[in-house]
């Protein structure tokens, strides 16, 4: 990576020292739980290594992926009365790169998994997908934006219990080289009467609940909503091409407010065009802030 034309051998790793004190997060001892060791933990290690390398070679490193498998399993009662298990790994975005935006809604590179098609899940289990769509403003801002996460809504057509491992609920995916963090993830239970409750992550009042869910009950007609995060941005948002910002707004990847507040691009909402002079002024204001 740092010397791409040099032959790889053991000597290249001699300068690297890894320190893992006993009973730390990366060197857990019995009886500490380690179910997420190959998923949540390994993805965070990769993210941390990217952040470290970015200090030495920011032109080669990408923003962090969502760095989560977001694995959930749920029991469901089939029409014949038997119990089945529905499982999926809702994906998030990958980080912005030195040459382009990150990919939208793609499984973490360590997972070697694919998104389950909603149609396949509905054929196999008593559930209905109410939503599987891109989540606006979820990618980290940057010269090259982080890929977007998604909004997953799964309605139960029977009773069930849901367990899930997730993270990125207090801080999103970090960017590099001036790129910014993505939005955070959130798990929500929507009741049959339309009211909702955040069961993992931050609620509107700023309260937080652990995203490690265990046997959360759902009854027929209730919906589980998961909002996955995007990837971290690469480069400063004010360096992003203004036409790319406009395209993002028109594609509903970002909102008008984000275009103005973060990217400093002034867009006429009616004409869907850029006010270049006002944009120059706005970007100067944000640069001086």
PLM regions with names:
Residues 1-289:
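Glycine/proline-enriched, intrinsically flexible loops and inter-domain linkers
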